[in-house]
UniProtKB/Swiss-Prot annotation:
Residues 66-68 form a propeptide. It is found in: Cell membrane. Belongs to the G protein gamma family. It is a lipid-anchor. It holds the Pfam family G-gamma. It comes from the Eukaryota. This is Guanine nucleotide-binding protein G(I)/G(S)/G(O) subunit gamma-5. The lineage of its organism: Eukaryota, Metazoa, Chordata, Craniata, Vertebrata. A lipid is attached at residue 65 (S-geranylgeranyl cysteine). G proteins are composed of 3 units, alpha, beta and gamma. GO terms for cellular component: extracellular exosome; heterotrimeric G-protein complex; membrane; plasma membrane. The modification Phosphoserine is found at residue 2.
């Protein structure tokens, strides 16, 4: 039983390796440059960099309403 399961496992490994061999690869330097350019282009829309206005912040402390 272990022989047939070993063959099946190896077939899965070969299939995965064939899939990975067919992928297009990008150099790390090119990927880093693209990521940096994307970050710089979209920095004005990033709430972690620009902050969130208090009127649109759903996590702001709620105001207490009290009736006299």
């Amino acid at each position: 039983m272990s022989g047939s399961s070993s063959v099946a496992a190896m077939k899965k490994v070969v299939q995965q390796l064939r899939l990975e061999a067919g992928l297009n690869r990008v150099k790390v330097s090119q990927a880093a440059a693209d990521l940096k350019q994307f970050c710089l282009q979209n920095a004005q829309h990033d709430p972690l960099l620009t902050g969130v206005s208090s009127s649109t912040n759903p996590f702001r402390p709620q105001k207490v309403c009290s009736f006299l």
